[in-house]
């Protein structure tokens, strides 16, 4: 995504990108439009279906999508977790869970909700707000729109629109995106 923005192939990217210091060296970002909730997906009939905390995932074989904080920061927090290589895409990650190659995947709430629609045998586990949640920084979970460095006109225009939106507006947009997101590779 970053190379497409840098090269001018696209003007901006709205794709759940965390606003990290590393990415900010390569592209500019709008103000955050979303703060991601980290969730875990398991199979309804799997060994970890009753997990109520990260600790309860002890020993699980897990994966997530490449180039995400879910894979880089969250999976290592699972005690004795068997961390598989990062998956190329959200659909690939979900297919790994569906096929039994892993016990759980860690991702964000919108991806998790969409996955449960595409895969009814998945269960969404949300440890947010409990003592057993994944430990992340605000930088890890603040989501913004990336654009080419120095494109202040576009950045200001997007920030102007974002500043007028309410939490309900954002939630409605997220729900609409979830309803049309093609997460199944079948």
What do the predicted segments below correspond to?
Residues 1-186:
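Proline/Glycine/Serine-rich low-complexity intrinsically disordered segments
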């Amino acid at each position: 995504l970053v190379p497409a923005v840098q090269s001018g192939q696209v003007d901006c990217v709205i794709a759940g990108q965390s606003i990290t210091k590393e990415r900010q060296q390569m592209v500019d970002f709008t103000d955050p439009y979303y703060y991601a909730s980290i969730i875990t997906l398991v199979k309804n009939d799997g060994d970890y279906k009753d997990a109520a905390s990260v600790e309860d995932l002890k020993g699980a074989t897990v994966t997530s999508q490449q180039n995400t904080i879910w894979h880089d920061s969250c999976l290592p927090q699972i005690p004795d977790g068997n961390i598989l290589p990062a998956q190329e895409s959200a659909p690939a990650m979900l297919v790994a869970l569906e096929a039994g190659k892993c016990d759980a995947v860690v991702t964000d709430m919108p991806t998790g909700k969409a996955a449960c629609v595409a895969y009814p045998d998945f269960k969404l586990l949300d440890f947010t707000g409990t003592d057993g949640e994944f430990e992340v920084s605000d930088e890890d979970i603040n989501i913004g729109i990336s654009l080419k460095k120095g494109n202040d006109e576009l950045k200001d225009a997007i920030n102007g629109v974002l500043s007028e939106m309410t939490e309900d507006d954002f939630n409605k947009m997220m729900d609409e995106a979830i309803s049309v997101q093609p997460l199944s590779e079948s």
